[in-house]
Amino acid sequence: MTIKSIISKHIKKVLNIIKIFITHEDLAIVRTSDKKVWDYQVNGIIKLANNLNKNPYVLSKYIISNMRYYEYKMYKKITASKLGFINIFINKTWLEKELTKKIKSFRLGIKKVTPKNIIIDYSSPNVAKKMHVGHLRSTILGDATARILEFLGHNVMRINHIGDWGTHFGMIIAYLKQNFISYNEINQLDLNELYQKAKVNFDLDSEFSKKTRNYVVKLQKKDKECIRIWKKIVKKTITENQKIYKKLNVTLTNKHIVGESFYNDMLPDIIQDLKTKKIAKQCNGAYIVFLNKFKNRDGAPMGVIIQKQDGAFLYSTIDLACLKYRCEVLRADQILYFIDSRQKEYLKQILEIAKKAGYISNNIIIRHNEFGMICSKNKRPFSTRSGNNIILSDLINEAIKRAKKIAKNKNKNLSNKELEYLSEKIGIGAIKYFDLSKNRLTDYIFKWDEILTFDGNTAPYMQYAYIRILSIFKKLNISMLKLSGNIILTELLENKLAIKLFQFEEIILESLQHSAPHIICKYLYELSKIFSKFYEKCSIYKSKNTKIRKNRLLLSLLTARTLKKGLFIIGISTIKYM
């Protein structure tokens, strides 16, 4: 239970007596900022009172008097402002008792929820192309969400919906044939370069375009030679991508790959089903679904093509089969898509068709967690000087290279092995955390000097904050694993730190509600700052009172464990030295 949920439960209990029924969201309970004296504030009473034609102050006073009547031990003081805000001060004794429980818990007192089957569709790069910087956000936002959901106890099905089918394979096969490149030579080729050359031919040569389309149809009809080439290209790409996932500390593996080709055998049935249900209509030889909720430029219902005149299927057909499979076979309770905001309208159309066809039941939650772009200093999509997408492996290597220089400057006594280890943990952590710390919905500017700094809300700062706490125990020669006891709060800063530590579960749930890992990043940064103030003002080394020292060590231990767990569930590694 979180403090917010307990307050909500108590207020709802009071209001239910006078037949007022509200939701947790209606109460609008907020945490204090560092400058405020209260710990929590209930803001929703004003709106509630206005809706009921009651005086907000009078209603707030009624709630407070009845909360006191129930004598809940967690409250030190509850007050009402003249406007109707309820200010809550948490009881120190209650906080001490609850934090002591957290220290004794491997999960920091956070209980697992009733599990749901949740599919997360993320990363999903195209085969025969190198992963570029544009894949970074989907990959690490999706992975962080998967980790958080698993930590809370949900059954998470990661799906890497790779683009292993479609026109680009027809282009590549046509190019290989045109240039007499044999099957055995494919492994020696740069697939990215091969794709780019094939794309130029496709755009400029109508005859080549025709051959491409013929090979696409051959692939769909399972032509043996085309399938053999296709498998070779897919395998080579997956091997390269898996190296990137491993370096990024991303939990996607080969077993999570369910590419577009997986649905091939289902596509004819999808077309037939939509025809039978009179959802798809034939138009000039193609099959189209017209959607009244979506309008084209002329104001007429938008048409979504699901099968072309030549019999070829489209991405729309694949995505419909994919949705049907996930809902009916995998029996998902929720499906979360981490795909580009530019796909928003298209995904809405696919969902609308799937609902019309009855593939999605009303109790399934489907959410498009769109995200903004990574931009360069000129606020345009982050790319090379020539305008090409930056290759993700190059970006990772550059981060490690820069981190290596920083680690070397900080500690010239590091061995080569230590230097390699640190540069990878710091560099990878830095680019991931910089992305995760930004609001998912906004674009952000990629700046190396901000990514790898030890000041502010960055991975290096967080990693250093963790090391700093470890050094306290090392200096005092005390084992963090063996330290135990009851927390006693004697100073105001200890109390502030304790409240912040207790909010960890609250933060995780809020982050998940909005699919917003930046909420966790912000919390961890604020926790580190409060601990820094606590460390400066509440002496650990100089304290002559052994009980006070032990208590402060317990708070330090809980802070370290919270930082480590918080970073872990968003995919950032901690380090023990620097």
From Swiss-Prot:
GO CC terms, sorted: cytoplasm
Listed Gene3D superfamilies: Arginyl tRNA synthetase N-terminal domain, HUPs, Isoleucyl-tRNA Synthetase, Domain 1
EC number(s) recorded for this UniProt protein: 6.1.1.19
InterPro entries in alphabetical order: aa-tRNA-synth_I_CS (IPR001412), Arg-tRNA-ligase (IPR001278), Arg-tRNA-synth_N (IPR005148), Arg-tRNA-synth_N_sf (IPR036695), ArgRS_core (IPR035684), DALR_anticod-bd (IPR008909), Rossmann-like_a/b/a_fold (IPR014729), tRNAsynth_Ia_anticodon-bd (IPR009080)
Main location: cytoplasm
Pfam families, A to Z: Arg_tRNA_synt_N (PF03485), DALR_1 (PF05746), tRNA-synt_1d (PF00750)
Lineage top rank: taxon: Bacteria
Residue numbers covered by motif 'HIGH' region: 125-135
Keywords: Aminoacyl-tRNA synthetase, ATP-binding, Cytoplasm, Ligase, Nucleotide-binding, Protein biosynthesis
Catalytic activity field: tRNA(Arg) + L-arginine + ATP = L-arginyl-tRNA(Arg) + AMP + diphosphate
Family: Belongs to the class-I aminoacyl-tRNA synthetase family.
Subunit structure as annotated in this protein's UniProt entry: Monomer.
Record-linked NCBIfam families: argS
Protein name: Arginine--tRNA ligase
Organism: Buchnera aphidicola subsp. Baizongia pistaciae (strain Bp)
Gene: argS
